[in-house]
Amino acid sequence: MVAPGSVTSRLGSVFPFLLVLVDLQYEGAECGVNADVEKHLELGKKLLAAGQLADALSQFHAAVDGDPDNYIAYYRRATVFLAMGKSKAALPDLTKVIQLKMDFTAARLQRGHLLLKQGKLDEAEDDFKKVLKSNPSENEEKEAQSQLIKSDEMQRLRSQALNAFGSGDYTAAIAFLDKILEVCVWDAELRELRAECFIKEGEPRKAISDLKAASKLKNDNTEAFYKISTLYYQLGDHELSLSEVRECLKLDQDHKRCFAHYKQVKKLNKLIESAEELIRDGRYTDATSKYESVMKTEPSIAEYTVRSKERICHCFSKDEKPVEAIRVCSEVLQMEPDNVNALKDRAEAYLIEEMYDEAIQDYETAQEHNENDQQIREGLEKAQRLLKQSQKRDYYKILGVKRNAKKQEIIKAYRKLALQWHPDNFQNEEEKKKAEKKFIDIAAAKEVLSDPEMRKKFDDGEDPLDAESQQGGGGNPFHRSWNSWQGFNPFSSGGPFRFKFHFN
């Protein structure tokens, strides 16, 4: 149940509260209604006062059905419609009241209010003038005179708005229309005119807001739905564009412009949905191809080019193609320097390329625009660890492989280097010591990078063979001497070592 106070507030916002009181206190007996109709009217009045609008409406429906010539039944039903925000339904009832009882000034005054809000200024003025000629109460007379002055002001502003629009002064036209629409809030034509001004001024989202209101205020407003759809499309919001153009076709399935636009939006939407599904499945190369098709399908709207390149940048980054990712992400960032998604994806590509300073810079820029993003925070911490790590021992550099190298590449590089730096190949004592140190590093790199768990730790900026990195200090239990590597077979894939190194 709605509280009576809230109903009073809603009623008062629609028309003068005094008129509601007139309605509620008006005695139905004056119409000579039968007992059943009188019962419905009285019960409906009580329900309305209690805020039970739907139940009150049912009672007044019954009263109208029971006595189609009862002006009080129509008037009270109009009151409920207005309280429910259904002004379109209230207007015919008020007109019926006036037809049945020409001197019912309360109904005529209420209708004048509605007509004024709809922007039907001539009709509203006619009602207010007739109220003044019908022996109104003091309050009704004041209200009618006030509304006549307001209507006259709206006429003047409308003329100024149309002149400004015609001369191409859209800023002035908007200023005039703003004032009119504070009063004529339900005028669909004026909202459509202001939407055109917003479009001319490069403010499409404000235009959409007015057009959405116009689509509700005017029945079968296919033109509004078409314009909303095209505006969303130009903004790059293909999903909302598709939704709005479908509303147009629901009203008129043969609407030529809506149907042509529908086919274009649907084609683009299908490509984008397919590309996103491929990304979710990890099929980044195929997704890239789809987004290239998006750019070819709609080359004239820059928004689709930017969004497509943003997603291609993401695909290259996730597919560990850092050179391509950096190139495309940079193209996006030239157009949108604050694009957080492109900054994150380029930062990840920089990490693969071991460009840690650049990665840190991108993460920090992204964090300025989205400080609560956990992915950015973790990425920045990782980049900082890797920068610090790069200043120490880098197992990837030791083996001469990229950070995204496969295990097979790592083993191949290890075997080649282990053979090259085998200490038995060196006779000079100094060279042998250098080779021993080099061989230890090579073996350590192979041990870390060929083990998924140890490699992940290293990729996250932690050296699994460095006790200080793992424990914050102390000795290094994993730092091995040359003697500990004797018997290590660089050409074995696992199991007991059969190959022995021999020293003089």
UniProtKB/Swiss-Prot annotation:
One of its GO terms (molecular function) is protein-folding chaperone binding. Widely expressed with high level in the pancreas and testis. Also expressed in cell lines with different levels. PROSITE patterns: DNAJ_2, TPR, TPR_REGION. Residues 1-31 form the signal peptide. GO terms for biological process: cellular response to cold; defense response to virus; negative regulation of apoptotic process; negative regulation of endoplasmic reticulum stress-induced eIF2 alpha phosphorylation; negative regulation of translation in response to endoplasmic reticulum stress; positive regulation of translation initiation in response to endoplasmic reticulum stress; protein folding in endoplasmic reticulum; proteolysis involved in protein catabolic process. Its main location: endoplasmic reticulum. TPR repeats lie at residues 37-70, 72-104, 105-138, 154-187, 189-221, 222-255, 268-301, 306-339, 340-373. Residues 451-481 are annotated as: Disordered. Induction: Up-regulated during an endoplasmic reticulum stress via ATF6. Activated in response to infection by influenza virus through the dissociation of DNAJB1. Down-regulated by DNAJB1 and THAP12. Disulfide bonds join C248-C258, C313-C329. GO terms for cellular component: azurophil granule lumen; cytoplasm; cytosol; endoplasmic reticulum; endoplasmic reticulum lumen; extracellular exosome; extracellular region; extracellular vesicle. Pfam families: DnaJ, TPR_1, TPR_16, TPR_19, TPR_8. It is linked to Ataxia, combined cerebellar and peripheral, with hearing loss and diabetes mellitus: A disease characterized by juvenile-onset diabetes and neurodegeneration, resulting in ataxia, upper-motor-neuron damage, peripheral neuropathy, hearing loss, and cerebral atrophy. This is DnaJ homolog subfamily C member 3. It comes from Homo sapiens.
